[in-house]
Amino acid sequence: ENLGVRKAIDIAFGQAVPFLYDIDRDVCVECFSCVEACELDAIDFSQVPEEVAFNVGTIIIATGWDIYEPYGEYGYGKFENVIHQAQLERILAPNGPLEGHVHRISDTKKPKEIVFIQCVGSRDTERPYCSGVCCMLSLKNGKLLKQEFPEANITICYIDMRTNEKGFEEYYQRAKNSDIRMIRGKVGEITEDPETKN
């Protein structure tokens, strides 16, 4: 997704366990200046990947998810200020490219209107299932954006608000009470003003 530049020697992500630096072979140019600079002699380019066996009591299988490329009619890939949820997550992250401070991609201004469109690529004839995470993700990100931009109009458009886990309905009510507007319905079309990029 190229949502942030990673250094050749970096920590994989802010919450990595163990919290250690590693060499990203995709970024490293193998100049070996890091070997000379490291006073602890901790860098060894002769190491090769190895398999390590662990005895554990529990295995957690986290399958993750794939990025769905949104439909063209919503302007993704056409309008600069249309991004998807994974990009917003990266932008909002304190260790992301904007260090958690959001601005419009087109002109770096503060956003005044923010709209979340739910169920893009799911709950339709091709993919009738619900992803199970998007509603809560939009509520969380909507609340974060409302904290940073209290004057912004934030709207979440949804088919059904899926808040079916413990505490989710209360979270939904708190989001509504923080002046996030909820509209039940599908968005028909997104257009852009060519001058303002709104």
Where are these regions (language model features)?
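A conserved beta-strand/loop element that lines the FAD pocket in flavoprotein oxidoreductases
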Residues: 41-46, 54, 175-188
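Receiver (REC) domain switch/active-site residues of two-component response regulators
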Residues: 57
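Short, polar loop motifs at secondary-structure junctions
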Residues: 65-66, 187-189
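Amphipathic alpha-helical
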Residues: 158-179
